[in-house]
Amino acid sequence: MAHVLRAPGSPYSVQRILKPIYKTCVCHLLNLHRSHNAQKGDGSCEFEAFQSGHCSGTMLDVVRGIQAQIGLEPGYYTIPKCRANLLKYQPERKDLPERSMKDSFTTAVLPLSTIPIRERYVNHLGLVRMGRLMEELDLFAVWICHRHLCIPTLPKGIPVPYNFFTFLYDSVDFTNINEISAFEDIELCGHVSWTGNSSMELTIYMRQKMRTVAKAIIMMVARNATNTRSAPVNALKPANEEEQLCFENSIERQKKRTAKKSKSVLNVKPTSSDEQLMYETFKRTRGTDALSVNMPVKLPPNCKWMSESFQTTMLHAFPENRNSNNYIFAGFVMRTAVEISFIAACIHAGGRPLIQCIMDVAFYRPLKVNSFLKVTAYVVYTFERYIQLLTIVQALDANSMVKITTNVLHLTYKAEGKVKEVLPSSYQETLWYINGRNKFAAFQNLRGTRKVDKKSQKTVRTGEK
């Protein structure tokens, strides 16, 4: 579940943000942006077909909305308040009405144009902290889940007997990333694009100055009030042709996700082409004399060993990073992983590369609030100006000292110039190298096939040479 326990950064920003007149102005500006895009007819607004006119205000309003939905009381308790009394309100799937994509569609604004808010999201160069944006993205995803949920039998005033958790980030594709300003508001908008029995796929956009800067596909899961079992969600029924097309694309993604997991080189035996790549890499570093036992390993020119291309850190999470179940919320994990990955990419590139994509972010286990976090970012593949990273998050229980892997992320960065090639020196590293190569190919495919609003009959190809 997303972070809904944070305190506002400044009392002045809170007063300004929560003023109804400011919220009205925000929504009015969003409508102007949409009208502008419609008049341009350039297909830049992929989500126009799902507009519902609903505006949730600012991201602080979103936080308060989630708190009100789940009946969250202020204060930290080592044992969260029992919600077992809400189990009797848990509906059956048949009692939940069907919902369309417009029902869950909403917009919210991250008001970076206000100075007190901006300070939280800016780095020392005056640029936007991408890790902070990932926190807001995760929070907004939970809000969309609440928007989709409709329980006709729930009495008025009773908290929603649900918990929503991040299950998977299929992809976060960044565009116009070098033009994101820390002095302009960022708009988040999105909707549910597919549902299972207790799972939902969400499509979310981040926009600034009427331009899309990121598109995310996220999988969320619903749990009951006590987080002891899955909970059913409203079935999604497309309301028109555009929603039907989006729904069909989501079904295809779901099939690909299942197939991708079963074909990963980290889970199954390498293919013949993978083995050929292993052999070619071996020859590059060992030479042709394979009979020499004590032959020194040779590093080709302008290359670097994978074993030397990583950065790691240990963190102690605190209650301020928790969700209502006293687990570390997914947004904090995403922010931390993105920031450590950026450091690893910077050191390898010798500059400040720009993030291009995050994909296949797995959430294996929840992180307890008393956990120590070990985050390690490995450079596993490079191609010209691109750097592919594998970032692993491990939890170390503060009591038992048992270490478990909780998250795995795959990130792509682009440097200003050509970077050193990274090469593996062990079998495990070679598997990571092949997997990184496959992830980079998936990123290229994502960039090469990105499509926009069908009505415009245009396809934007932003793959870079």
Task: Specify the residue positions occupied by each region the protein language model found.
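Catalytic strand-loop segment that frames the active site of acyl-thioester-processing enzymes
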Residues: 43-129, 243-330, 448-465
